[in-house]
Amino acid sequence: MFANIGWGEMLVLVIAGLVILGPERLPGAIRWTSGALRQARDYVSGATSQLRQDLGPEFDDLREPLQELQKLRGMTPRAAITKHLLDGDDSFLTGKFDDERPKQQPQTPAAQDKPEEKPDKPAGPVFDPDAT
């Protein structure tokens, strides 16, 4: 629950607690908060163990679809489509097909290397600032 709270944030919370509650009531508030969190954690673990006892081996069958959903949460839309609809073949989405292999150009001696000349026309489309 507090896995992504760093020491800096904890320090800000303690200072805010000192300002809001004062030094007299802060230790009691910390004890109450830690007790409430501990009790909530015990309730959750108790509910999990009770479900495990009630369902028996079916509990693991219930967890499998949840684990599959957890795997899907981390996927991007492109990865999900590639995995489930295209069987891992993303050439349809990337446009890189097997029969189009990059052709290797013959190597020329280094003495004949010339600096590339800039083309007269821009490489991209013409930009028209008046177009809407």
From Swiss-Prot:
Q: How does it sit in the membrane?
A: Single-pass membrane protein
Cellular localization per UniProt: Cell membrane
HAMAP family according to UniProt = TatB
Span list, region Disordered: 91-132
Provide this UniProt record's keywords sorted from A to Z.
Cell membrane, Membrane, Protein transport, Translocation, Transmembrane, Transmembrane helix, Transport
The family classification in the record reads: Belongs to the TatB family.
Q: Which GO terms describe its molecular function?
A: protein transmembrane transporter activity
Q: Which organism is it from?
A: Mycolicibacterium smegmatis (strain ATCC 700084 / mc(2)155)
What this protein is reported to do is described as: Part of the twin-arginine translocation (Tat) system that transports large folded proteins containing a characteristic twin-arginine motif in their signal peptide across membranes. Together with TatC, TatB is part of a receptor directly interacting with Tat signal peptides. TatB may form an oligomeric binding site that transiently accommodates folded Tat precursor proteins before their translocation.
| Single GO BP term | protein transport by the Tat complex
Assembly description: The Tat system comprises two distinct complexes: a TatABC complex, containing multiple copies of TatA, TatB and TatC subunits, and a separate TatA complex, containing only TatA subunits. Substrates initially bind to the TatABC complex, which probably triggers association of the separate TatA complex to form the active translocon.
Membrane-spanning segments: 2-22
This protein is called Sec-independent protein translocase protein TatB
| GO CC terms in record | TAT protein transport complex
| Keyword check for Membrane | yes
